[in-house]
Regions:
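HhH-family (HhH-GPD) DNA N-glycosylase catalytic core used in base-excision repair
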Residues: 1-190
């Protein structure tokens, strides 16, 4: 259920009207198709850290994650060794879950392998829908997220269950899911 916000717009029920960062994310980022591998990698790292937590918690720490993970530079993250992992575990600005931190490095390496195979991670991701945006709402997983999750796990990625991947696909605009009544519900994206 949407409520009227102070700016007169209705938004998805999950958007927190008291968090400006969250409002900007909802209005300007969530559901916008992404074809840039740097942005796709950043969102994959953040979505994996979200597993079991609220997205708002991760979003509030986004800048700290960006600093801690070298601007989400793929090659830098791929090169992380034990010293860097230990430093990340001690970083109070991020979620200090050792398994998720290790997964970020493992996933970076798998991401790079996928780039080599498909020319880009975007090429890999968008091939699942033949480059088209999927319009659906009210779900936490789908047959599409099931297939992509299974494939990413087969490639060695961690924290990429179907619910995480569904949220990722929504975040990067492969799946467009603004709630009924949201001012962005009927926006056509390309």
């Amino acid at each position: 259920m949407q409520m009227e916000w102070s700016d007169g717009k209705k938004r998805c029920c999950w958007a927190n009207p008291k968090n400006e960062r969250y409002i900007r994310y909802h209005d300007e980022e969530w559901g916008v198709p992404v074809h840039d591998d740097g942005k796709l990698f950043e969102m994959l790292v953040l979505e994996c850290f979200q597993a079991g937590l609220s997205w708002e918690c991760v979003l509030n720490k986004r800048e700290a994650f960006r600093a801690a993970f070298d601007g989400f530079d793929l090659e830098a993250v791929c090169a992380y060794g034990e010293d860097k992992l230990e430093a990340l575990v001690r970083d109070p600005g991020i979620i200090r879950n050792r398994l998720k931190i290790q997964a970020a490095v493992t996933n970076a390496r798998a991401f790079r392998e996928i780039q080599g195979e498909y020319g880009s991670f975007a090429g890999y991701l968008w091939h699942w829908t033949e480059g088209k945006v999927v319009y659906e709402s009210g779900l936490t997983h789908s047959e599409l997220s099931d297939r992509i999750s299974k494939d990413l796990k087969k490639r060695g990625m961690k924290f990429v269950g179907t619910t995480v991947i569904y949220a990722y696909l929504q975040a990067v605009g492969v799946i467009y899911s603004h709630d009924g009544g949201c001012f962005l519900e009927h926006k056509t994206v390309v």
